[in-house]
Amino acid sequence: RISDIAALHPDLVILSFGTNESHNRRYNTLLHYRQMDELVRMLRDSLPNVPLLMTTPPGSYDSFRKSRRRRTYSINPRTAIAVETMRRFADDNGLAVWDMYEAVGGRQRACLNWQEAKLMRPDHVHYLPEGYVLQGELFYQALLKAYNDYVGY
């Protein structure tokens, strides 16, 4: 609930989503945009002076049943569409955005880099703990760099 977030008196709210939305085979960009808009409006109403930062999802795979016992995996093509929708929303609404999808390889390598480094769970969507640690470190480094660029370091 938004009231629970407001009760924390945050200095920054980070909105990180897109993976689950893009895993819906009926992913709808208009619906996703509207949902983000509704959430951001509620946050801004409750926390008018708190900056909001969005992060895009990393790459992930779609799973298909190849036979009764075997599944095959391919890169989820809707992730790139969700990222594009999120970037457009952030731009339209004056939100900062960290594009994790591009930071970890974009359309060509985002999934493959994590899979080859053995940082993904067998579901090919979620990370192992080490993967989440790396995600946090990448975000921290990007945030620190943006701050240093801002203050002129």
Question: For the regions a protein language model found, what residue spans apply to each?
Answer:
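Alpha-helical scaffolding within the catalytic cores
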Residues: 1-6, 34-42, 83, 109
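Alpha-helix N-cap/loop-to-helix boundary motif
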Residues: 28-35, 74, 78
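Structural recognition of the beta-strand scaffold that forms the well-ordered cores
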Residues: 12-16, 51-56, 96-100, 126
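Catalytic His-Asp segment of secreted/periplasmic serine-dependent ester chemistry enzymes
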Residues: 60-153
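Short, functional N-terminal and low-complexity linear motifs
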Residues: 2-10, 49-52, 101-107
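Extended hydrophobic-aromatic, low-complexity segments
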Residues: 24-25, 51-55, 63-66, 108-109
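Oxyanion-hole/transition-state-stabilizing segment in secreted/luminal serine hydrolases
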Residues: 1-33, 59-60
